[in-house]
UniProtKB/Swiss-Prot annotation:
Coiled coil: none annotated. Pathway: Amino-acid biosynthesis; L-methionine biosynthesis via salvage pathway; L-methionine from S-methyl-5-thio-alpha-D-ribose 1-phosphate: step 3/6; Amino-acid biosynthesis; L-methionine biosynthesis via salvage pathway; L-methionine from S-methyl-5-thio-alpha-D-ribose 1-phosphate: step 4/6. Mg(2+) binds at D13, E15, D196. Substrate binds at S133, S134, K170. Belongs to the HAD-like hydrolase superfamily. MasA/MtnC family. The lineage of its organism: Eukaryota, Fungi, Dikarya, Ascomycota, Pezizomycotina. Its EC number is 3.1.3.77. Pfam families: Hydrolase. One of its GO terms (biological process) is L-methionine salvage from methylthioadenosine. This is Enolase-phosphatase E1.
């Protein structure tokens, strides 16, 4: 690891990489489910809610109960689709604003992000940190604005955000090529992608990026063959 060339861009996954998988599964998703009925009852005809309702397929947006049933079904099956992600982000925004939600970053994350970005402009230093997650870009920004770090808001250190809408599926090499193409001044080989998902790491590598599997507490155990053929880290301090 130490001999690897320092990247110019670090591209970070979120769930299982910068925060525990359990935060999304056991905190964010249940919060959205619990907040959904009252939000639909109070805001169904509100202008601010109209675009979220309109994004759902017409057959599921005719009544609050129909939309709620469809949203619950999608969340139960962990379907990653844009209109659901947008609705979840809207629901989470209120939770973050009230203090009910706060993203529990692994303790090495905030210091390392600050270290990477403070090295901008130095020879061999990292100039940019970016995010690529299946969660919507607005939800990503909310998470990094309300973290357990000190200070809690990390958004000033993050240059750009990508999701499955503006970049594409995370297991397809073309998505990483699309991300890198937005910054043509940085060759793909000078990007470092960090994720707990082996298929995502393989896709990024196929697109020419350096990529590492991040093995965090609570993540599924990695097969031995993965450790033999891919870079694996347990903390950003190893980078």
């Amino acid at each position: 690891m130490a001999a690897a060339k320092k990247p110019r861009v670090v591209l970070l996954d979120i769930e299982g990489t910068v925060c525990p998988i359990s935060f999304v599964k056991d905190v964010l998703f249940p919060y959205a489910l619990s907040a959904l009925p009252s939000t639909l009852a109070q805001e169904w005809d509100a202008p601010a809610f109209a675009r979220y309702r309109a994004a759902f397929p017409a057959e599921h947006a005719s009544t609050p109960s129909a939309l709620a049933a469809h949203a619950r079904d999608l969340m139960a099956r962990d379907v990653k689709i844009g209109y659901l992600k947008a609705l979840q982000g809207y629901l989470w925004e209120a939770g973050y604003a009230s203090g009910a939600l706060r993203a529990p970053l692994f303790e090495d994350v905030a210091p390392k992000v600050r270290e990477w970005t403070s090295a901008a402009g130095e020879e061999g230093g990292v100039a940019r940190v970016m995010i690529y997650s299946s969660g919507s870009v607005p939800a990503q920004k909310l998470l990094f604005r309300h973290t357990s770090g000190e200070p809690a808001d990390l958004t000033d250190a993050i240059t750009d955000y990508f999701d499955t809408v503006n970049a594409g599926p995370k297991t397809e090499p073309a998505s990483y090529e699309r991300i890198a193409a937005k910054y043509p001044e940085v060759p793909a080989g000078e990007w470092l992608f960090l994720s707990d998902n082996v298929r995502e790491v393989e896709a990024a590598r196929e697109a020419g990026m350096r990529a590492c599997v991040v093995q965090r507490p609570g993540n599924a155990e990695l097969p031995e063959d993965v450790r033999g053929r891919l870079e694996v880290v347990e903390s950003f301090e190893e980078l």
